[in-house]
């Protein structure tokens, strides 16, 4: 199999509109949790969100293009722009059919659905926007990124709910390994903080009942009550190693393992025995040709819901055995909230930065240990630790499990 490296990264998040801003916030433990501002949440079961502030699509694309995209697509294009620019990829020197795109969204545009339903009910079907469908469908994240940057290779959209970003990068990784592309622009995006999107998750009792910004997103903490809904995008440029070397690209990290499984258990809850997530982790580690004892850090899915954090802990212990007690486990969602389809991609970026700097970020807000979640969740500040591998997990509604193993790059 061909080696696959990361040569560019881009992020649009509630705590920073670039990888640098985002990473600085992560290191500082800076969050952006507050009551929803985009609509009145008085009658909702939940009130806290991690909204993106000060995003201007015209900073990343022309006005005409922005007008023909919904917010989730705009986030994707913005993150892709940063990633491609960092990679130094020059499409005038590439075979465009060897450069592909795999940027997914778990939901697409709830905004268009809400507006269209209102128009349909008040003005009739004749007044619906002719672009309604291409605006709302989730594959337009990948479609718009490919159009904006001239990517004519394999162009796919993975939709696996909260595992979308991780699966998107994993499938892009496989695509390059199998010689179906030399470069893939991959990641996830989401912008679903709307009355219906927020209300749906609240009705499911998935969102936190807390209104305390310091205690609303607290993965693995005994007092956790649900996740904080966030939004944003994460995109990476994946590249075949020799292709990257030939053009003098700076290599940020290397993908060395990908595991993907299904629970076949429940539409929202992970399997209680953790077997599906455990097998995904096991396969990712096995592909790299290393022992589970060689992995000392897991960036967990860690949503701050009771079921996820408990069953993911069980899965980690099932995979790593006694070694799990010695490992560091954290959750980036303690800082960003849950970015849904974008979460896994942003967490891959987090892993790359941690490997580069030898720093594992704290799980912000973690205070009260849960006797059932009994691992080291990095609750007392960042940890300086020179690690070689970072394993990141994503678990999506429907029983979708994905794990990626990222390695500190060595020639």
Segments and roles (model prediction):
Residues 6, 27-160, 189-198, 292-308:
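Conserved beta-ketoacyl condensing-enzyme motif
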Residues 8, 26, 80, 101, ...:
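Conserved small-residue
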Residues 3-7, 34, 212-288, 297, ...:
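Condensing-enzyme catalytic core mediating Claisen C-C bond formation in acyl metabolism
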Residues 180-225, 258-272, 302-309, 326-376:
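Acyl-CoA/ACP chain-elongation machinery
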Residues 83-95, 244-250, 281-297, 319-323:
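Phosphate/pyrophosphate-binding loops at sites that engage ATP/ADP/AMP, CoA/4′-phosphopantetheine
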Residues 1-65, 242-254, 349-363, 407-411:
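ACP-dependent fatty acid/polyketide chain-elongation machinery
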Residues 122-129, 167-170, 174, 190-246, ...:
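Glycine-/small-residue-rich "gating" segment that lines the acyl/pantetheine channel
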Residues 76-89, 138-142, 146-149, 154-190, ...:
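Active-site-proximal alpha-helical scaffold in enzymes
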């Amino acid at each position: 199999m061909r080696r696959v490296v990361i040569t560019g990264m881009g992020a649009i998040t509630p705590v920073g509109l670039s990888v640098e801003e985002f990473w600085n916030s992560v290191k500082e433990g800076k969050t952006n949790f507050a009551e929803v501002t985009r609509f009145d949440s008085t009658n909702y079961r939940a009130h806290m969100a991690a909204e993106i502030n000060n995003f201007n699509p015209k900073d990343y694309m022309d006005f005409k293009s922005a007008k023909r995209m919904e917010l989730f697509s705009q986030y994707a294009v913005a993150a892709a722009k940063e990633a491609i620019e960092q990679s130094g990829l020059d499409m005038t020197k590439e075979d465009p059919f060897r450069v592909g795109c795999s940027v997914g969204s778990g939901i697409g545009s709830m905004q268009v659905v809400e507006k269209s339903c209102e128009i349909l009910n008040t003005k009739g079907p004749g007044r619906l926007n002719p672009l309604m469908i291409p605006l709302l469908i989730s594959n337009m994240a990948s479609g718009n990124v490919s159009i904006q940057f001239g990517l004519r290779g394999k162009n796919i959209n993975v939709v696996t709910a909260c595992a979308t970003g991780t699966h998107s990068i994993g499938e892009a990784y496989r695509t390059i390994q199998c010689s179906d592309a030399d470069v893939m622009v991959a990641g996830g995006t989401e912008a679903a903080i709307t009355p219906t999107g927020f209300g749906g998750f609240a009705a499911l009792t998935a969102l936190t009942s807390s209104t305390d910004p310091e205690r609303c997103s607290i993965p693995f903490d005994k007092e956790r009550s649900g996740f904080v809904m966030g939004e944003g995008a994460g995109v990476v440029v994946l590249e075949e190693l020799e292709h990257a070397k030939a053009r003098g690209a700076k290599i940020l990290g290397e993908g060395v393992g990908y595991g993907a499984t299904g629970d076949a258990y429940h539409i929202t809850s992970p399997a209680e025995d953790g077997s599906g997530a455990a097998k995904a982790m096991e396969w990712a580690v096995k592909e790299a040709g290393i022992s589970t004892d060689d992995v000392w850090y897991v960036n967990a899915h860690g949503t701050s819901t009771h079921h996820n954090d408990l069953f993911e802990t069980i899965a980690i212990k099932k995979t790593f055995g006694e070694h799990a007690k010695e490992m560091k486990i954290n959750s980036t969602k303690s800082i960003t909230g849950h970015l849904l389809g974008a979460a896994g991609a942003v967490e891959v970026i987090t892993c790359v930065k941690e490997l580069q700097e030898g720093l594992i970020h704290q799980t912000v807000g973690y205070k009260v240990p849960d006797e059932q979640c009994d691992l080291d969740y990095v609750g007392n500040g960042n940890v300086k630790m020179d690690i070689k591998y970072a394993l990141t997990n994503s678990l999506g509604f429907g029983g979708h499990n994905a794990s990626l193993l990222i390695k500190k790059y060595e020639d």
